[in-house]
Amino acid sequence: MALINEHFLKLQNNYLFSDIAKKVNSFKVTHPKDKIIRMGIGDVTQPLAPAVIEAMHKAVEEMASKDTFHGYGPEQGYPFLIDAIIKNDYASRGVFIEPSEVFISDGAKSDCGNIGDMLRHDNSIGVTDPVYPVYIDSNVMSGRTGVLENGKWSDVVYIPCTAENNFVPDLPSRRVDILYLCYPNNPTGTTLTKDELKKWVNYALANDVLIMYDSAYEAYIQDPNIPHSIYEIKGAKKVAIEFRSFSKTAGFTGIRCGYTVVPKELNAFTLDGQRVQLNKLWNRRQCTKFNGTSYITQRGAEAVYSTAGKQQVTATINYYMTNAKIMKEGLQNCGLTVYGGDNAPYLWLKTPDGLSSWKFFDKLLYEVKIVGTPGVGFGPSGEGYLRLTAFGDRDDTLEAMARLRKWLR
């Protein structure tokens, strides 16, 4: 008799974005002629950079010749992409990373969810709240979260990020073994300064805390004083794993490519206190469970770092950040309170008149035909907020702001 992992039964019935999709589909059934403007799920809308397309076309053509055909690649990724990553994402910022510390994958979401494979089930978890749901759900599956009580998991330490603390989390009062940080932040669109991030690195160093640092949106940082990598902070390689993605940087949501950095200086412990290098464990895990990202995909990712690729990708990022500027100004002109959107493609909107997140979601959908993401879906501290994304088409962005002005006047 096969027995299941009963921790899966603890998961809430639906993933946040599945619930949204059901509500939108119900609306479409009763309002088939209405145009919905989607500002909810953070999927991109602009095409891949021409340099990426050209590189992938060339890679496809290589597959048609016996002399240039590529079969299984290295589980860790091809050296040509790893070298480009190190040169452009780290060395350019004064950070030394070894090639064997970079692991190419099919995206940051997979790695964020899979990284727990090499960690015991009884580690204590800390998350900033509100939080990207994958951090919580993947730990529910692994049995680290306890039971759900009044919207919170009993064994998870929630660290509030609210307007009251300027969205800068305080150090936790309870002990945590593993801490998830995401900056620029999803969902609030806020950031940490170098000094604020240094506080967390020092805390981790002093308390043997492992930081899972998700910097999937670092390419959207506009302020030169905001760190792009946690490894810009001294000592961070001893305490942090960093996740990166080409999804929002270069529009790879449908291509799937990202990478994770696991420094060789980073250790965790056995029950009897022996230090174990996490780089070796992650490499072993990947060699067993992952056959590597496709050659064609990795050639496309490499092209992101070419001269033309950088220019084209930056132009697309600027397009989205202009959307964010239009949205933030438009929302503020409507008398709404909004955060984020300056160094991230997300805006965190305070719901008006004390409405709950889902109530405001429903009003926006049915009265304005705009879809956002209810803040409460990201955690208890998200109640009373709605996340909007700047990944839409420019015309849709302008139309959405016009609809809101008309609705709120």
Swiss-Prot record:
Pfam families: Aminotran_1_2. The keyword Transferase applies. Pyridoxal 5'-phosphate binds at residues 72, 108-109, 132, 186, 217, 245-247, 256, 291. The modification N6-(pyridoxal phosphate)lysine is found at residue 248. CDD domains: AAT_like. Pathway: Amino-acid biosynthesis; L-lysine biosynthesis via DAP pathway; LL-2,6-diaminopimelate from (S)-tetrahydrodipicolinate (aminotransferase route): step 1/1. Its cofactor is pyridoxal 5'-phosphate. Homodimer. It catalyses: (2S,6S)-2,6-diaminopimelate + 2-oxoglutarate = (S)-2,3,4,5-tetrahydrodipicolinate + L-glutamate + H2O + H(+). Belongs to the class-I pyridoxal-phosphate-dependent aminotransferase family. LL-diaminopimelate aminotransferase subfamily. GO terms for molecular function: L,L-diaminopimelate aminotransferase activity; pyridoxal phosphate binding. This is LL-diaminopimelate aminotransferase. Transmembrane segments: none annotated. Substrate binds at residues 15, 42, 109, 132, 186, 291, 387. Involved in the synthesis of meso-diaminopimelate (m-DAP or DL-DAP), required for both lysine and peptidoglycan biosynthesis. Catalyzes the direct conversion of tetrahydrodipicolinate to LL-diaminopimelate. The gene is dapL. Keywords: Aminotransferase, Pyridoxal phosphate, Transferase. GO terms for biological process: lysine biosynthetic process via diaminopimelate, diaminopimelate-aminotransferase pathway. Its EC number is 2.6.1.83. The keyword Transferase applies.
